[in-house]
Amino acid sequence: MPVPPLTSHRQTYSRALRPKPESLRVFICDDDLDFAAELASALATCGFEARTLLDGRTPIEIFELFAPDVILLDLFMPPPDGFEMMNHIVQNVAHRHLSLVIMSGGDAGMLQTADHFCAARGIVASAVLQKPIHLGDVLQVCNAHGRRKNDGME
């Protein structure tokens, strides 16, 4: 399913971001819009509802409106960066149910630092992936989250 275009009507746009009740929602929080769009398209083909960053909304606004089950979070973006987004997730207990996938083109040491950053704040990353990522790794996290959700474990 293509990502709805940004319209001049804020209310229409907000409705488009609201999740469908039965589908697993994946937010691709990455400033590489081509990469994010390609990944969103692949996830949609697999039956997931995926959203990316769109002009006119901050990552936090999209995150709050879309209420994702899984967030694929790039560490290095213009503010708010991945670390600020992780802090936002930690501060909001309602978001503790989600599966967090940390992604970066940085080296393995940076990814390990991000994983420790999460753990120190009481959240566990479901996966830590170095770019270029593989769709199979993302699908594994999404499917595991879907199973937990269907089993009522969250």
Residue ranges and their predicted role:
Residues A36, P78-P79:
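The feature encodes the CheY-like receiver
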Residues D55-T58, D81-N87:
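Acidic catalytic/metal-coordinating carboxylates
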Residues E84, H97, G106-V128, Q140:
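Alpha4 helix (beta4-alpha4-beta5 surface) of REC/receiver domains from two-component response regulators
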Residues D74:
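Active-site residues of response regulator receiver
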Residues M1-F27, V124, H134-E154:
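Non-catalytic signal-transmission and effector/linker regions of two-component phosphorelay proteins
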Residues A67-D69, V93-V101, V124:
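His-Asp phosphorelay/catalytic-motif detector in bacterial-type signaling
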Residues K20-D34, L39-L43:
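Conserved acidic segment of CheY-like receiver
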Residues T52-V70:
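Acidic, metal-coordinating helix/loop segments flanking the phosphotransfer/catalytic sites
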